[in-house]
A protein has these predicted regions:
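N-terminal small/polar loop signature for handling phosphorylated ligands or for N-terminal nucleophile
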Residues: 17-90
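Single conserved hydrophobic/aromatic residue that forms the stacking wall/gate
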Residues: 1-8, 13, 188
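A glycine/threonine-rich phosphate-anchoring loop and its flanking beta-alpha core
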Residues: 85-186
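A generic structural signal for short coil/turn motifs at secondary-structure boundaries
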Residues: 1, 25, 164-167
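Glycine-rich His-Gly loop
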Residues: 10, 68, 120
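A short N-terminal beta->alpha junction/helix N-cap motif
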Residues: 9-10, 14, 39, 166-169
Length: 189
């Protein structure tokens, strides 16, 4: 039996109908699935741990992160914690440095589930990067995770997701892209 876990950013992704075509296709294929949509726009470690706990109970073979960068980043952390429940977040998270010079070796991913990223906006590129940003709700610190193990196994970029997005989301995504471009010009690698 194949099982899939759909990670959506907030209930608005589900309420906007983005999950329906995917859920319909999974039903049509006879794939048992569930949806975890308790992901805030600025995902917290607590939310990621709750998602990983739900995944552990459901035991999916495939994790589908649908939404913007928040859903994909949260999905990556959930995937990491689902695959490696003993992994220590404090070891994985650190101020950003060259991804090739990390002092922590991430555990191998993909033993339990494939990770598929489907963006609904074009702001972060998280669907094709080995990075995730997650906020430690206890300290308020946003921590970057950087390792090639966090690369999704597959990215499905459907332009219909962006073309049907509300104008406000499209504007915010454009500003997000510009912010990332400016930030990278000031980053010392």
């Amino acid at each position: 039996e194949i099982c899939a876990c759909l990670v959506g950013s907030e209930m608005c992704i589900r309420d906007s109908g983005y999950t329906k075509p995917i859920e319909d296709k999974l039903d049509q294929m006879g794939i048992v699935h569930t949806c975890f949509s308790d992901v805030a726009p600025d995902p917290s470690l607590a939310s990621a741990k709750a998602g990983a706990k739900a995944m552990t109970a459901f035991e999916p073979d495939c994790i589908i992160a649908l939404g913007g960068g928040s859903a994909m980043d949260a999905g990556k952390v959930m995937w990491m914690l689902y695959e490696n429940p003993d992994a220590d977040f404090s070891d994985m998270s650190m101020d950003f440095m060259d991804i090739r010079k990390r002092v922590y070796t991430f555990p191998k991913m993909g033993k339990k589930a494939y990770f598929v990223a489907i963006p609904t906006s074009s702001g972060t590129g998280s669907e094709v990067t080995p990075f995730a940003i997650i906020t430690d709700q206890d300290t308020g610190v946003k921590w970057p995770l950087a390792d090639y193990e966090l690369l999704p196994d597959m990215a499905i970029v459907d332009t219909n997701n962006m073309m049907s997005a509300p104008k406000g989301l499209t504007r915010a995504s454009g500003i997000d892209v510009m912010t990332h471009a400016i930030a990278v010009s000031y980053t010392h690698l």
